[in-house]
Amino acid sequence: MNRKSIAKGKLVRRFGVNIFEQPKYDKLLKKKPNPPGMHGRSRRTKVTEYGKQLIEKQKVKFTYGVSERQLTNVFKEARRQHGVTGDNLLALLERRIDNIVYRAGFAISRAHARQIVSHGIIILNGRRVTIPSITLRANDIIQVKEKDSLKKLVRSNIEKTSTLRKLPDWIEVNADALNVKIIRTPSRDEIPTLANEQMIVEYYSKRA
């Protein structure tokens, strides 16, 4: 297991949930359910309200692989929109182009999806893009660059992930043409993110 895998394993154990949505971390949590450095049934330190909010914020930050600045900007945009700020926050993160690549099964992880976008493998509405943080909207279409080796890679990823995760109803995936159409913005119950978004809103609201 490489250093990055070890670090992800520690994060999963710290949060107590599989934020990376990969089977190996479910197995890890069953084997080692306690946070790193805590053995057996050691008593947990009481967490303050601020501490709880921070944990929820960190969950989302590491789930989507975004920086602190990026997450702060997403919160500001979510607050400007109509509706529930917490729901808006998660919906904006879900509609990042790297997350769409991941949800569609074109990549085995979000980190891999970011690489795919950064390397110019994805075409958005007919134009090549290299920015993983682009937010997609209804009727946007992404597809894989016309290159046999790239298509072979993505098809292999689709095959690997097909039994691991369910395709969301708010995107339409054509596995043959290797394209994805955004149908609509996802509702909260369609987002499997394991975090309390209201606590994240409270965290940022106190710092606004």
UniProtKB/Swiss-Prot annotation:
- Segments forming domain S4 RNA-binding: 95-157
Statement: the UniProt record of this protein carries the keyword Electron transport: no
Cross-referenced Pfam families, in alphabetical order? Ribosomal_S4, S4
Q: Name one GO cellular component term.
A: small ribosomal subunit
- Molecular functions per Gene Ontology: rRNA binding; structural constituent of ribosome
**Record keywords, A-Z:** Ribonucleoprotein, Ribosomal protein, RNA-binding, rRNA-binding
Any one Gene Ontology BP term = translation
Matching InterPro entries, A to Z?
A: Ribosomal_uS4, Ribosomal_uS4_bac-type, Ribosomal_uS4_CS, Ribosomal_uS4_N, S4_RNA-bd, S4_RNA-bd_sf
Q: Which residues form the signal peptide?
A: none
Disulfide bond sites: none
Q: Subunit notes for this chain?
A: Part of the 30S ribosomal subunit. Contacts protein S5. The interaction surface between S4 and S5 is involved in control of translational fidelity.
Q: Which PANTHER family match?
A: 30S 40S RIBOSOMAL PROTEIN, SMALL RIBOSOMAL SUBUNIT PROTEIN US4M
In the record, the note on similarity to other proteins reads: Belongs to the universal ribosomal protein uS4 family.
What is the role of this chain? One of the primary rRNA binding proteins, it binds directly to 16S rRNA where it nucleates assembly of the body of the 30S subunit.
Task: Please give the HAMAP family that the UniProt record associates with this protein.
Answer: Ribosomal_uS4_B
According to UniProt, the name of this protein is Small ribosomal subunit protein uS4
Source organism of this protein record: Borrelia duttonii (strain Ly)
The coding gene here is rpsD
